[in-house]
Amino acid sequence: MNMQAHLAVLAAAVSIYPAFAQQFGTAENLAPDIPTPQPIVERMLEAAHVKPGELVYDLGSGDGRVVITAAQKFGARAVGVEIRPDLCRIASERIKAMGLEDRVKIVQGSALRVDLSPADVVTMFLLTTSNERLKPTLEKYLKPRTRVVSNQFPIKGWKPVETVRARAGAMGYSIYVYEIGHTE
C-alpha cells in the first residue's frame, strides 16, 4: 500500500470511528506507524536549515530514516525517540550497519517524557491531537530559536515561520516549520 493509500485509510478511520482517533494522541502512543517518504524527510530537514553538528530529535522515529538522513546528508547528530521496541531494534540495526553509532542514537520511550532541551531541531509526523499534547513540553523545554518541523499536521495556536508544500509521488505534503520564540 502506498503512502497516499495509508493516509486515506487513516483519515477514513479517524472520521468514521472516533475510538480509533482516541487510540492515538492518548496515553503514550502518539501516532500510527506511517513512514515518511524519503523525499519528504529530506525536504523537512532542508526546511529546518539543519547544519553540521546540530542536534536533531525525531519524535516517533520509526525505522530511523529521519535521524539517519540528518547524520548522512546534513552532518548533524541525531536522536530518534520511538515507543515501539520492534521499531527501535530495526532503527538501531540500520544505524549500526551504516556505521553511524557515533552520531545517531535511538531512545525507546515516550516523546512526552524525553528531555528535548539539547535539541536544535525537532521533527515529527504525529497527529494534531498529539502535537497539542506535546506543545506545552516544547514551549517549556526548547530553547529560543529551536526549529520544530511537523509533517502534515500543524501545531494549533502556533504560527509557522514557513509552510512548505512538497510532493512524493502523487501525494502532496504540508511541512510546517516553527521557531521557538517566534510562534505567535
Label the predicted regions:
Residues 1-9:
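Bacterial N-terminal signal peptides that target proteins for export
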Residues 17-51:
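Class I SAM-dependent transferase core
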Residues 53-62:
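Conserved class I S-adenosyl-L-methionine
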Residues 64-68:
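Glycine-rich SAM-binding Motif I of class I
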Residues 77-82:
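Conserved SAM-binding motif I beta-strand of class I
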Residues 117-133:
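A short SAM/SAH-binding and catalytic strip from SAM-dependent methyltransferases
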Residues 129-184:
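C-terminal substrate-binding/active-site "lid" region of AdoMet-derived donor-dependent transferases
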